From Swiss-Prot:
InterPro entries: SfsA, SfsA_C, SfsA_N. One of its GO terms (molecular function) is DNA binding. Belongs to the SfsA family. Transmembrane segments: none annotated. NCBIfam families: sfsA. This is Sugar fermentation stimulation protein homolog. Signal peptide: none annotated.
Length: 247
């Protein structure tokens, strides 16, 4: 990956080692650098289980908070695992989707020229809506983003904890397709060792069933590998989707 990824981390990031996680959204780390090590609390916006990533002594990279008045001055961006970085910031998929759209790096969104964040769809809001010029004949394209940090036997898998909210999103996407519009799931695999993608039926069998039901109904599934480094996050290749059991 180049030193100029689609999402570049701001200046002033710190690195160190993981100590513990408290109350889902707070992580204690010990900083590394020229000075004496210091223990600091940082914010984690990842409410998932982060299976396999919360290991004492594991590397951590955190970015400075945009708001200097925030109680926790840092946000965890990366966790180290077996010599690689794993992206754990759950805002990254949304940001990368928008950046890739404007950079023309989403072949599946070719012809779309307008991008709206947090677009209202009925009684819900979805992460993005893309629109094309009226004379293009292309229907609106609705996109929901998911962050993927779990890999088992080379298969990147989502979710890492049971998610009724995620199930709801798949049902909403199927309804959009029934209305004649496009609906897509953007799964960002923020680690290098996932070579294909599938729903984690061993974590949430309901979600896994809905995933394949949605795919069969016409919901488009786009699992992209992210290119993750200490410089930032870039968009990598599409990964193949594991077929449903028995196929």
């Amino acid at each position: 990956m180049s030193d100029s990824p689609l999402i570049a981390f701001p200046r002033g990031c710190i690195t160190g080692t993981f100590i513990r996680r408290v109350k889902r959204f707070s992580v204690e780390m010990e900083t590394a650098g020229a000075g004496a090590p210091e223990r600091v609390w940082i914010h984690s916006n990842n409410s998932g289980s982060m299976l396999g990533l919360l290991r004492a002594g594991a590397p951590v990279l955190a970015s400075p908070a945009a708001n200097p008045a925030r109680k926790l001055k840092w946000t965890q961006e990366l966790a180290g695992l077996d010599g690689m970085w794993v992206g754990v910031n759950t805002q990254t998929p949304n940001r990368l989707l928008e950046a890739a759209f404007h950079a023309g790096r989403l072949p599946w969104a070719a012809g779309y020229t307008m991008f709206r964040r947090e677009a209202r769809c009925g009684a819900s809001r979805l992460d993005a809506r893309m629109d094309a010029p009226q004379d293009s004949g292309l229907p609106p394209l609705w996109v929901e983003c998911k962050n993927v940090t779990m890999v088992e036997d080379d298969v990147a898998a989502f979710p890492d904890a049971a998610t009724e909210r995620g199930q709801k999103h798949l049902r909403e996407m199927m309804e959009i397709v029934r209305q004649g519009q496009r609906a897509a799931m953007f799964y960002l695999v923020q680690r290098a060792d996932g070579h294909c993608f599938g729903p984690a039926d061993y974590v949430d069998p309901v979600y896994a069933g809905l995933f394949y039901e949605a795919a069969a109904a016409g919901v488009e599934m786009y699992p992209h590998r992210a290119l993750v480094s200490e410089h930032g996050i870039d968009l990598g290749p599409l990964l193949p989707v594991v077929p449903p059991p028995g196929v």
